[in-house]
Amino acid sequence: MGRTVDADAGAVRFAYPGVSFFVRFEGTSLAMDAASTGVRSYLDVVVDGAVRTLHLDPVARRYVLADVLPPGVHTAQVLHRSETWHGTVTLTRFATDGGFVTPPALPARRLLFLGDSVTCGEALERTPPGPKQPVWWNPRVSYGMLAGAALGGQVQLVCHGGRGLVRSWDGRTDEFNLGRLYELAIADPGRPEGWDQRRYAPDLIVSAIGTNDFNQGLPEREAYVSEYVRLVRTLRRDHPQARIVLTEGAILDGEKKAALRAYLDETVRRVADAWVSRVVSRHYPGDAADAHPTREQHARMADDLVPQLREVMGW
């Protein structure tokens, strides 16, 4: 589940958060051969419901995911916790002392969440004091993943911390922002890998972007709306079966939140398509340690979003 790139000898490469692999095996142990291009990549390993977090090395090696299990059939999920800029992961193979059986089927419903660091789950598992740590990211319990689970759907996350629709948090316009991120499977500027949109046909696309665009002040309205219209029309072209929902996200408040909502309304008006709409996001301020929403706030964000998405989709 999520965007991957095929590599040599059956290996796969991936970088977006939330990319997941589901394995079912009959045996007493499970291992994985993998490596990252950086030193800040983390995975969650969920075996028969028990969760542990694994730190990846930049040198390829074997990781024991589970051992001394009771004989029988077991189910595992391996989920990428980290962002693209933490490192690109190569997963070469899984191994077991028994045999692999048919993995669990993914849900038929498909969701795509486009966004920034909030969608990536930045710092939602923070443990201050001290500086921010890469292990604090956890998309597994982010609002998008929680909403997808509540709606009975699989989820693909396309997100990058600090990025926006037209500019990054510091005002730069020469980095990959949302339109380019959407086109990529791996958004590493040194080695970008394209994504074939035919590989995943979402029923619902949720775009939660804008916080970083507004960090330096209000972006010029016409330029912003025009770019959003262009992106939405691209989404409709690539995925005519999908409903598209725009929302402003959780961090903005006050004048900036009101302005972004107005920009979104204007985007929806110009697109003039019944399959494109806007939903409301409440403000969640994070806490004293970090402005990103906490784990508990992500759960509330999902609770806010799910009824609105059910109404849009008729689910």
Give names to the regions the model predicted.
Residues 1-114, 118-139, 314-315:
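N-terminal secretory targeting modules
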Residues 16-18, 84-86, 124, 129-226, ...:
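Conserved SGNH/GDSL esterase-like catalytic core that processes O-acyl groups on lipids
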Residues 106, 236-239:
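Short, conserved loop/helix-junction motifs that constitute active-site signature segments
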Residues 110, 154, 242-243, 277:
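Proline-centered loop/turn at the N-terminus of a beta-strand
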Residues 110-115, 199-208, 274-279:
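Short coil-to-beta-strand
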Residues 114-117, 158-162, 208-212, 247-251, ...:
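Active-site-proximal beta-strand/loop segments in catalytic clefts of secreted hydrolases
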Residues 141, 145, 149, 226-233, ...:
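Solvent-exposed, polar/charged alpha-helical surfaces in well-ordered, non-transmembrane soluble domains
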Residues 250-315:
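Catalytic His-Asp segment of secreted/periplasmic serine-dependent ester chemistry enzymes
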